[in-house]
From Swiss-Prot:
It catalyses: tRNA(Phe) + L-phenylalanine + ATP = L-phenylalanyl-tRNA(Phe) + AMP + diphosphate + H(+). Transmembrane segments: none annotated. Keywords: Aminoacyl-tRNA synthetase, ATP-binding, Cytoplasm, Ligase, Magnesium, Metal-binding, Nucleotide-binding, Protein biosynthesis, RNA-binding, tRNA-binding. Binds 2 magnesium ions per tetramer. Its cofactor is Mg(2+). Belongs to the phenylalanyl-tRNA synthetase beta subunit family. Type 1 subfamily. This is Phenylalanine--tRNA ligase beta subunit. GO terms for molecular function: ATP binding; catalytic activity, acting on a protein; magnesium ion binding; phenylalanine-tRNA ligase activity; transferase activity; tRNA binding. It comes from Staphylococcus aureus (strain MRSA252). It is found in: Cytoplasm.
Amino acid sequence: MLISNEWLKEYVTIDDSVSNLAERITRTGIEVDDLIDYTKDIKNLVVGFVKSKEKHPDADKLNVCQVDIGEDEPVQIVCGAPNVDAGQYVIVAKVGGRLPGGIKIKRAKLRGERSEGMICSLQEIGISSNYIPKSFESGIFVFSESQVPGTDALQALYLDDQVMEFDLTPNRADALSMIGTAYEVAALYNTKMTKPETTSNELELSANDELTVTIENEDKVPYYSARVVHDVTIEPSPIWMQVRLIKAGIRPINNVVDISNYVLLEYGQPLHMFDQDAIGSQQIVVRQANEGEKMTTLDDTERELLTSDIVITNGQTPIALAGVMGGDFSEVKEHTSNIVIEGAIFDPVSIRHTSRRLNLRSESSSRFEKGIATEFVDEAVDRACYLLQTYANGKVLKDRVSSGELGAFITPIDITADKINRTIGFDLSQNDIVTIFNQLGFDTEINDDVITVQVPSRRKDITIKEDLIEEVARIYGYDDIPSTLPVFEKVTSGQLTDRQYKTRMVKEVLEGAGLDQAITYSLVSKEDATAFAMQQRQTIDLLMPMSEAHASLRQSLLPHLIEAASYNVARKNKDVKLFEIGNVFFANGEGELPDQVEYLSGILTGDYVVNQWQGKKETVDFYLAKGVVDRVSEKLNLEFSYRRADIDGLHPGRTAEILLENKVIGFIGELHPTLAADNDLKRTYVFELNFDALMAVSVGYINYQPIPRFPGMSRDIALEVDQNIPAADLLSTIHAHGGNILKDTLVFDVYQGEHLEKGKKSIAIRLNYLDTEETLTDERVSKVQAEIEAALIEQGAVIR
């Protein structure tokens, strides 16, 4: 939105520079993106009067003009503009003057004739050709009214001005108008805002005698009104109005069209003006378009309509596409005499869909899309009637023809001074707060401690108490909020919560094991939403996802970790070890919030040991991944157990569930070869744990023991067993018969292949013995070892 300071002064008067005003507006929530100064780079620009014009003796397209610029004698200026003529008031850049683009005006001779200055077009003084009236597109600008030669041309053109460009957020649609901005400025400077004149001298003839209005779709069009103006004269609008439109980025057309656009900018209320005699009937019917119905819009384009489009009709034929663009046969033309002015409220969603589908974005549609102020609908139409009467010689018929209900002009919200002060740390009295609301143009009522604020419809961004609190903070001034320290009744030393402490421990363990922490998106594709999910629950899908890859909330962290590993491997980083602690989401019943559960997941692929100085290269395998998980359990003083499992997406023979206190809390396994190949990964191992479940278990105390005074002893045992017997079953048997001197076991080799029967595998296990009270003897260890071997043989193992 472009806000002219010269125009703004018509509604509110302040004693401050435009730069200070722009800074103040920005600091209170509306960003002023740019400040356009029309006086910049311009010097010695005056009004001139062309006293005479003669053809240049040596150039067919040049004219020698004698121009009065308010000095003792006229100056001679050679001009090539086709529309220059004697008797015109024009813009003159004097010798020594300067124009935009660094152009300096000097005395010169053009084809032998002296030229002392330059008669200027609007383009030459910095106006974009996009906004210049068509009558001056290819020539100099000519004032339509008498001027005083020698006066400042920028002042005569209302261009002695600076324009603020607002970068508005969607919630501040009120600032899409001059009056809305004036309310804001008046509040900032605690001054009054003056509204423009809207009262016309009306004829005794009633508009109801010439027109009827019917709404067939009040769910989409809650209100539609029209007023009638007769005997308008189509001519250029006054210069001040044209220039204000130009500064706002709109090309002037004629007085009737310009008044429509002017009121749009003034009130933020889009209007449409129909040629009453071209409508074709005395009725206006608002309805939904019929399927396949066609109409030609003002841009001479035939549009095929959908039933979702709203149309204004003469009872049969569409004469306008509501809120977007008018129809061609009812538009205002040079011979138009009688005008019907439309003011309405249209459904924002319908207007947005229509304008986007037809690629017809306009000043009107953008305002309807954001919602308009009900308080300004009729007032804007009345303002247009007044301007047509004043600047188009129109005769305004009395009464308004309307259908539907405008709705409330205000929304009451109750609040207290205590609530405001407690929220933002102020110490304002009730009177101070009421004054701020009154500055904003909000009426108030006081009942004891309660302030009832009447929020006008133009401020659609204010719907709850917190919005009112923000308004108080804005107008009072964020910079004026006092700096205070919080007061505590009791001061305690800060510390981590139990969950924070345990989370930090887990991260340290995983980082110490060589894994890097990853943070991935919570959104995945619909296909990946249930991949690796430990619970089969309904997914949570976005209504309008930005892409198919981010359409649903995840139920596992692994899809994005696999994607991250694949991304790294594709970029020559083939040894990837990642973990993530993050939330997954499970849907509940309709209308209920989803369950949000924190998971711990990891992925390992490539070599675990990669540098020679670290030792022999070690490729990631199941047992290494399990060792990482076991480190987590040891750090948390928990005991995990493992059980063979089949999980979609994982290798059927190298996957296990992870149990804690006989409850499944996760899984570990090798990525299925097909899935790994699809992601250009070699053997890859993953794990996932319900982190919330880990955190819920009481860790208890870790009991430390002195370093043993007596040496321990190790024995290795190699077993040949059926390939479907898990190592965990063998270890369970070993510990059951190891007595109190068997301290721990370690599987250090697994072999299948040559020299073994089909369906068999060899497992090598190290048994570590220790007695803390005395030195172990071979006889004692051998006895326990024999008992263990006997139990294993009974289980079906063959001692190798």
